[in-house]
């Protein structure tokens, strides 16, 4: 009986009101830190999505991963604390958060894997940089040809003018393709590009096939410029198809945002529950825990 009394007395000492208040405060602080780290991870992820360079994207992505790692570390520590003593409601709320956080991590992993690629930004840079220059060189060569051969046969002029017009259409189709998220819509755009490409090639090949134009420097320049443009267009379409910037932005604004709110709501509910848990009072005199009446001496 004495052993039982000592054990109960020891337990009460271990879980005194002051100590339970300290545990409650520590758990509340842990949940608060989880909420802050979760918000920091979300902000860093958004910065990674919106960054325009690979290096900046990687820097922000690393910050997001570090913040989510902190959330996970705190979640495990809180789980260990709950295993020692916690109400079933607290454990259930932590389990709810854990499920939501697992989904958050899955989305985060897929999203951050996209952010460092910046394929849409690179496609735009090619389209408005080297590709635009190659198209301009081709157009200028055809303009010189038309001015120089203004009195030539109508068929010859139509070949040059047709190639020039098709090139302009083809060039203007690139930016909408880069900004498009739908694969079927991109298929339609590429079909129109292929049609324009065939017309440009038909015009240039038709000019080069004429015996008196085989040595024409402007025709040669136009064909060389269009060859460079075609190579760049292939690269642009490949980058555009990956759509890493648009896909990561869509995920950030939809799936990630919803997962973030789910986790924050779960943590808020858990924080409220921890604060609401009652603290049992310890006996004022542990001697009263002994069994039987005091018999005196």
Describe the residue ranges of each PLM region.
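A structural signal for well-ordered alpha-helices, especially hydrophobic packing surfaces
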Residues: 2, 14, 38, 42-45, ...
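Amphipathic alpha-helical segments and their boundaries
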Residues: 2-41, 82-101, 120, 124-168, ...
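Transmembrane helix-loop junctions in multipass membrane proteins, especially transporters and channels
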Residues: 11-15, 52, 181
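Extracellular/periplasmic ligand-sensing ectodomains of membrane signal-transduction proteins
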Residues: 53, 57, 87, 101-102, ...
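Alpha-helical segments in soluble extracytoplasmic regions
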Residues: 53-81, 183-209
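Transmembrane helix-bundle signature of multi-pass membrane transporters/permeases
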Residues: 63, 130, 192, 254-255
């Amino acid at each position: 009986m004495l052993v039982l009394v000592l054990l109960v007395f020891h337990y009460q000492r271990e879980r005194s009101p002051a100590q339970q208040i300290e545990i409650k405060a520590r758990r509340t602080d842990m949940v608060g830190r989880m909420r802050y780290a979760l918000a920091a991870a979300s902000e860093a992820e958004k910065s990674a999505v919106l960054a325009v360079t690979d290096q900046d994207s990687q820097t922000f992505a690393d910050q997001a991963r570090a913040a989510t790692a902190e959330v996970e570390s705190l979640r495990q520590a809180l789980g260990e604390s709950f295993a020692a003593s916690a109400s079933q409601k607290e454990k259930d709320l932590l389990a709810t958060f854990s499920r939501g956080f697992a989904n958050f991590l899955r989305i985060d992993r897929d999203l951050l894997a996209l952010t460092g690629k910046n394929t849409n930004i690179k496609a735009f840079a090619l389209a408005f940089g080297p590709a635009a220059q190659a198209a301009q060189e081709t157009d200028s060569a055809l303009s010189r040809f038309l001015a120089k051969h203004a009195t030539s046969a109508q068929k010859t002029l139509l070949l040059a003018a047709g190639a020039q017009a098709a090139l302009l259409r083809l060039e203007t189709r690139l930016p909408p393709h880069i900004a498009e998220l739908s694969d079927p819509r991109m298929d339609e755009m590429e079909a129109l590009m292929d049609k324009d490409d065939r017309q440009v090639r038909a015009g240039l090949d038709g000019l080069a096939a004429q015996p008196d134009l085989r040595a024409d420097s402007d025709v040669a320049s136009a064909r060389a410029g269009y060859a460079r443009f075609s190579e760049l267009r292939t690269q642009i379409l490949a980058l555009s198809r990956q759509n890493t910037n648009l896909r990561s932005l869509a995920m950030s604004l939809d799936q990630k945002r919803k997962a973030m709110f789910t986790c924050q709501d779960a943590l808020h509910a858990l924080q409220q529950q921890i604060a609401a848990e009652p603290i049992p009072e310890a006996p004022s005199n542990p001697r009263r825990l002994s069994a039987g009446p005091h018999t005196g001496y």
